[in-house]
Regions:
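Short, surface-exposed loop/strand segments
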Residues: 31-32, 36-37
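Non-catalytic terminal regions of proteins
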Residues: 120-253
Length: 253
């Protein structure tokens, strides 16, 4: 889950809700794509494995605060991604391949498109990470050949999935003060530029098939500290009211 401290409280966005927003971005994306339906499935379900953890979330043992997704133990990360890949592949093999690439890419700087991406404690269990990446990469060619998908097309859709993931994360992580500008690699060696505009975001070049896109982010607000144990955290999440924070994406005026 995404944990955003807000003073003495924390705004929580579930990973599965973040993924649904990624799917909304994919649905609104302009342009022709023969694999559009599979790409939407991949975007909408790319974090589906996290539902197993979010059903029983745990405290960060270093801080006794709710655990942000980047700080979940790496062996647990890998377990969740394996579960998610299997679940998505059972629904749509092409989408499953994209989610496999996405999951491996989390540990490889998104295959060079986001070198700064680092997961807490990943270097401490590098052999587990290396085995996971090798395991996923070993199946790419066979699955791709079975789907009759070219490497160029697969890479293009992988990049688009990263766009939807990163843009959704930016929306979900929202900050009233506005985070700094963000650049995301697009296919055809282009770059998407995103910048805060109050509580909203501007996007250039404008990539969507609508004039502007309004996103409703489901949030839960809970105490940041004061939990006796994991059960207390789970109870707080269960009892928290689901609210919606609105973020509008628009072109640069």
């Amino acid at each position: 889950m995404i944990v955003r401290p807000t003073g003495d409280t924390a705004e929580i966005v579930l990973q599965v809700d973040h993924a649904v927003i990624s799917g909304q971005l994919a649905e609104a994306w302009a342009g022709e794509n023969t694999a559009r339906d599979s790409l939407i499935v991949a975007a909408r379900l790319h974090d589906i494995g996290w539902r197993h953890w979010e059903a029983e979330p745990r405290l960060n043992t270093d801080t006794d605060q709710p655990t942000n997704f980047l700080n979940v133990q790496i062996d647990e990360h890998l377990r969740l991604y394996r579960l998610g890949i299997e679940e998505v592949a059972a629904v749509d093999p092409y989408a499953g391949l994209l989610v496999s690439m996405h999951s491996a890419g989390i540990y490889t700087g998104r295959y060079g498109t986001q070198p700064a991406l680092k997961l807490t404690r990943a270097p401490d269990v590098q052999s587990l990470v290396d085995d996971f990446v090798a395991e996923q990469e070993a199946r790419y060619e066979a699955v791709r050949d079975g789907l009759d998908v070219s490497q160029d097309e697969l890479w293009r859709n992988y990049l688009l999935l990263q766009v939807f993931d990163r843009l959704s994360l930016r929306v979900c992580l929202g900050d009233p003060a506005g985070p700094g500008p963000m650049e995301v690699v697009l296919p055809e060696e282009q770059t998407l530029h995103i910048a805060a505009d109050g509580d909203d975001q501007t996007v250039a070049p404008w990539p969507f098939a609508v004039d502007q896109l309004t996103i409703e982010v489901p949030t839960r607000t809970i105490p940041l500290t004061g939990y006796a144990n994991d059960d207390a955290l789970r109870l707080a999440l269960e009892q928290a009211e689901v609210e919606h924070r609105t973020v509008t994406l628009r072109p640069v005026s």
